[in-house]
Design a protein with these regions (language model features):
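Conserved catalytic neighborhood of penicillin-recognizing serine enzymes
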Residues: 101-132, 194-224
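Small-residue-rich helix-loop
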Residues: 59-61, 231-405
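Active-site SXXK
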Residues: 56, 70-88, 211, 347
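A small/polar active-site loop signature that marks catalytic segments
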Residues: 139-296
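Positively charged n-region of N-terminal signal peptides that target proteins for export
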Residues: 1-4
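Beta-lactamase-like hydrolase cores
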Residues: 13-67, 136-146
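Short, well-structured active-site flanking segments
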Residues: 85-102, 179-184, 290-295
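Solvent-exposed coil/turn segments that connect beta secondary-structure elements
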Residues: 51-55, 63-66, 99-101, 110-112, ...
Length: 405
């Protein structure tokens, strides 16, 4: 299956192109390429590490222990924490009920990170729709109380504060002053009468794959807090930081120099080293538990935040790179795996000292693409004679979705 995916990728990127059998670059050659190209001024003294996945040998490193801004590369740590402390097959259920008391309703949540504020998006992607909950509960309240909507109380459990605020705003816009009261799970059950609706999320591993593929910041933040709570810590930035430290230490990775202010990578105060990320990539590659995490990474020239990369800059690398992007103003990072024949290398490039211009960031991305293009080789003998029609690229839910990386 892996070879078929690579073949399709190459056909898409290089139609009518003769692909000769390629041998893996030996570690010395890889080191030479990185040594020469990472000195390029476009990368502005990056932090870099390359590790042979088969042997665990560090093939090349430059500033690898220098703390740098990870940007969305931090989501690798978020996903690792999720697979460490949460069940990948876990689903999140959100249900609404008419209350046992007059003029009340109950929303029983499970901290579903997948709830969507946009109904059309929710329908398209199989997400729990907050607007559906709002309209359905409003209509049920009207019916149960003969149209009277004064002095309404909404009891809820396990909802995010943002979702609670949105529900209250919805009711206010419709002329209803609803009192929102948080209760325990047990109380919510005892206060519930007839069910209005119930919605289940996909499995957590599917949500995580989407989070990594499209670099969804809100999902990353919510999932990290779920993992933090499961690890026995608080569900805030401090708790997430403790959880991330434990994840690294649990994998035998020194957590010194790790600074986290969030779980999405948006904070410019976050710090991590290329060596920490590179070692993490090797550790999760060795453990089958993390296979879905790696499967959720964007593929160069094919999917997610890498779908438009390598196609022009290094077409020979299309389909051969799985990596997490990380972009902030003045930062262009990439961390993941590159296939080189029968070898695979884990790589981390943290270029966080760029000039804060679109041109500088674009030049840095192109330079990174070309570096990896020098290393990437398929295990593909022979010649591709003719390319089939354009291949459609969608996410795992069958949708073409664009987000920031």
């Amino acid at each position: 299956m892996k070879k078929l995916v690579v073949l399709a990728c190459l056909v898409l990127a290089i139609p009518n192109f003769a692909i000769q059998e390629a041998n893996a670059l030996d570690p010395n050659s890889v080191a030479s390429i990185f040594d020469r190209l990472t000195s390029n001024k476009e990368l502005a003294n990056p932090s870099v590490i390359v590790i042979d996945e088969k042997t665990g040998e560090i093939v090349f490193e430059k500033n690898s222990t220098s703390p740098r801004k990870p940007a969305s590369v931090l989501k690798l740590l978020t996903a690792t924490a999720a697979y460490t402390y949460l069940q990948p097959t876990q689903r999140f259920t959100t249900s609404a009920f008419v209350g046992t008391k007059a003029k009340t309703l109950v929303i029983q949540g499970s901290l579903d990170p997948w709830i969507s504020l946009i109904h059309t998006q929710a329908v398209k992607m199989g997400r729990t729709s907050l607007p559906r909950i709002e309209f359905s509960t409003l209509n049920a309240l009207k019916k149960a109380n003969n149209g009277s909507l004064r002095n309404i109380t909404i009891y809820y459990t396990n909802l995010y504060s943002q979702d609670v605020a949105n529900i209250q705003k919805f009711y206010f816009r419709h002329g209803v002053h609803a009192a929102m009261k948080r209760v325990t799970t047990e109380d919510a059950q005892s206060l519930s009468a007839d069910q209005i609706l119930s919605s289940d999320s996909p499995e957590l591993q599917e949500i995580l794959a989407f989070t990594l593929t499209w670099s969804d910041n809100l999902l990353a933040e919510r999932i990290a807090r779920l993992a933090s709570a499961a690890a026995g810590h608080t569900s805030d930035d401090a708790g997430v930081g403790q959880t991330f430290d434990e994840v690294l230490n649990g994998l035998g990775i020194e957590s010194k120099n790790l600074v986290t202010q969030d779980a999405s990578g948006l904070s410019k105060l976050n710090r991590i080293t290329a060596k920490q990320v590179g070692t993490l990539l090797i550790k999760i590659r060795e453990n089958a538990k993390f296979a879905p995490l790696i499967g959720g990474l964007p593929i160069g020239g094919i999917s997610g935040t890498l779908k438009d990369r390598f196609i022009k800059t290094a077409p020979q690398a299309v389909g051969l790179i799985k990596a997490k992007t990380g972009t902030l103003n003045g930062t262009s990072n990439l961390a993941g795996y590159v296939e080189s024949g029968d070898r695979e290398y884990a790589f981390v490039i943290l270029a966080d000292q760029l000039r804060k211009t679109h041109t500088a960031e674009s030049l840095a991305r192109n330079t990174v693409d070309r570096i990896l293009g020098r290393i990437a080789f398929p295990i593909l003998p022979g010649v591709i004679e003719e390319a089939p029609g354009q291949l459609g690229v969608t996410d795992q839910f069958g949708n073409q979705i664009t987000t920031t990386n």
